[in-house]
Amino acid sequence: RREAQHNEMNTMFAKKALLGAAAALTVLTLAGCSTPDSHEPADLQDFREMVSPKVSWTASVGESDGYLTPAVTENAVYAAGGSSLYRLDRHTGDKVWEAEAGSRIVAGVGTDGMHQAVVTDRGEVEVYDAEGKFIWRATLSAETDVPPLVGQGLVVVKTSDTRITAFDIVTGERRWHYQGQAPALTLQAFNQMAWSPAGILAGQANGRLLALGLNGKPVFDAVIGQAAGITEVERLIDVVGRPWVDNQLMCAAAFQGNLVCMSSTNGQLVWNAKVDSVTGPVA
């Protein structure tokens, strides 16, 4: 019996010794992996404040877990939160009306000043008139967090399956759709469409800026960023943010790509710069 206990104790000591040696070897290995040349955090650089905004008013419009964006017109601010759509007075922030959507709003608001469009978590686009009265809804082909583009007699929606669909602003009838292509991996980033003299501008996940006419036909397809690298992450080149447009120029930016400015009528290159953007251009 004593001999058995003695052997058991020896076995325990041997196991502890092996564990201790393994731990010591791990520490030595980690120490060998460290380097005295490790990068220290960079010093913060001074910057000059270009704009000093002042709060004119605030208003509560409920909660949001998506990319809900207010739409501003000459006299109104249209905003969404929860399952509600609001019209607020632009100058005072006072609520003019509140409309209840069919379910939680996940994308919006799009407006032309007379019609307001949002997308709900049921995968439906809903349109309301200037008084907040519901007009129509239509089922989409996929989910989206991109605000609808409203105007020119159309409500245009871009969905996650790279489809762009246009509906009649009055009846909700589908006018046309355009099917794009996307790489295997795309960036989850804020994105919006815009009107331009060339038509509807829509940034694509393949690093291109697409312009569609009011009939849904491509006007041009401009390269903003080109994929480079080996991994899918290194090759992310989504066009991000909202294209900036005036009568002469339109500019767009791509993640890990370029800032490109083109003629707003034909898409011909004016200038570009190597800029890695996650928000898009603002002027």
Give each language-model segment a name.
Residues 7-21:
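Bacterial N-terminal signal peptides that target proteins for export
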Residues 29-32:
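C-terminal motif of bacterial Sec signal peptides marking the signal peptidase cleavage site
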Residues 37-42, 47-71, 98-112, 135-151, ...:
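Extracytoplasmic beta-rich repeat domains
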Residues 76-79, 116-118, 155-157, 165, ...:
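Conserved beta-propeller blade signature
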Residues 80-82, 120-121, 159-160, 204-205, ...:
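Structural signature of WD-repeat beta-propellers
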Residues 80-91:
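Beta-propeller domains
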Residues 89-92, 129-133, 168-172, 213-217, ...:
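Short loop/turn segments that connect beta-strands within beta-propeller blades
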